[in-house]
Swiss-Prot record:
Coiled coil: none
Keyword tags: Hydrolase, Plant defense, Protein synthesis inhibitor, Toxin
Protein name: rRNA N-glycosylase sapovaccarin-S2
Function (record text): Exhibits N-glycosylase activity. Catalyzes the release of one adenine from a ribosome. Acts as a ribosome-inactivating protein and inhibits protein synthesis. Induces cell death in Huh-7 liver cells. May contribute to the protection against plant pests and predators or play a role in regulating the death of plant cells.
Tissue: Expressed in seeds; most abundant in the perisperm.
Miscellaneous: Thermostable at 68.9 degrees Celsius.
């Protein structure tokens, strides 16, 4: 399993950006081009090497994520508990116990724990118990300092579902979503390393990955859409206005 590491003990803007680029480059098929653009496209679903491991090296320990390479869904994470035992927590309908062993060999079968809620944002948000504002991940914010704090909430601690869900919401957005959307990657580097308030545009991007990918794949020529598109933050006519980092795999270009 390919492992990509982000050092958060002494991070820099450049390190974070190249970390996101490495995720993107690991899953892209350089031969695929959609809509006459140069935007990276995920390769066809792999038959082997289905997963990617990401190590988030915090100042007080490492927590790891398992991602599906065909869509960058976060399917599991690995953390030490309060007895210094490696535990792997996973979404059962996204990865099997045997596959989990290949991603996180440190955790024995008895130390694999099924996450009892769904892997979609709404399920994770409910378990994160966000009380302010929209009660969604938007209220948590983003940023390197926040990622480090959220890692500390799950590293070398007894499992607390609220802290786990908050860690997942922040980590998913700063890894997979940042790889999909340069807009998010750029917000993190612009505010580096500080925590910053998320905005509606971040959320609109995150829920529109499929829609945007399909529009570029099927209704875009030389980077220009055949009509105006509105993905929730105003009309766009050119694909480059979307600052995309990575498109969903939709087959060979038509």
């Amino acid at each position: 399993v390919v492992t990509i590491t982000l050092n958060l003990a002494n991070p820099s803007k450049g390190q974070y950006s190249s970390f996101v680029d490495r995720i993107r480059n690991n899953v892209r098929d350089p031969k695929l081009k959609y809509g006459g653009t140069d935007i990276a496209v995920i390769g066809a679903p792999p038959t082997r090497e289905k997963y990617l491991r990401i190590n988030l090296q915090g100042p007080r320990g490492t927590v790891s994520l398992g991602l599906r390479r065909e869509n960058l869904y976060v399917v599991a994470y690995l953390a030490m508990d309060n007895t210094n035992t490696n535990k792997a927590y996973y979404f059962r309908n996204q990865i099997t116990s045997a596959e989990l062993r290949t991603v996180f060999p440190e955790a024995t079968a008895t130390n694999q724990i099924v996450i009892q809620y769904g892997e979609d944002y709404q399920s994770i948000e409910r378990n994160a118990q966000i009380t302010q504002g929209s009660q969604s991940r938007k209220e948590l914010g983003l940023g390197i300092d926040l990622l480090v704090t959220s890692i500390d909430g799950v590293n070398r601690k007894a499992r607390v579902v609220r802290n786990e869900a908050r860690f997942l919401l922040i980590a998913i957005q700063m890894t997979a979503e940042a790889a999909r959307f340069r807009y998010i990657q750029n917000l993190v580097t612009f505010n580096f390393p500080k925590k910053f308030d998320s905005d509606n545009k971040v959320i609109q991007f995150e829920v529109s990955w499929g829609k945007i990918s399909r529009a570029i794949y099927g209704d875009c020529k030389n980077g220009v859409f055949n009509k105006d598109y509105d993905f929730g933050f105003g009309k766009v006519r050119q694909a480059k206005q979307l600052q995309m980092g990575l498109l969903m795999y939709l087959g060979r270009p038509g």
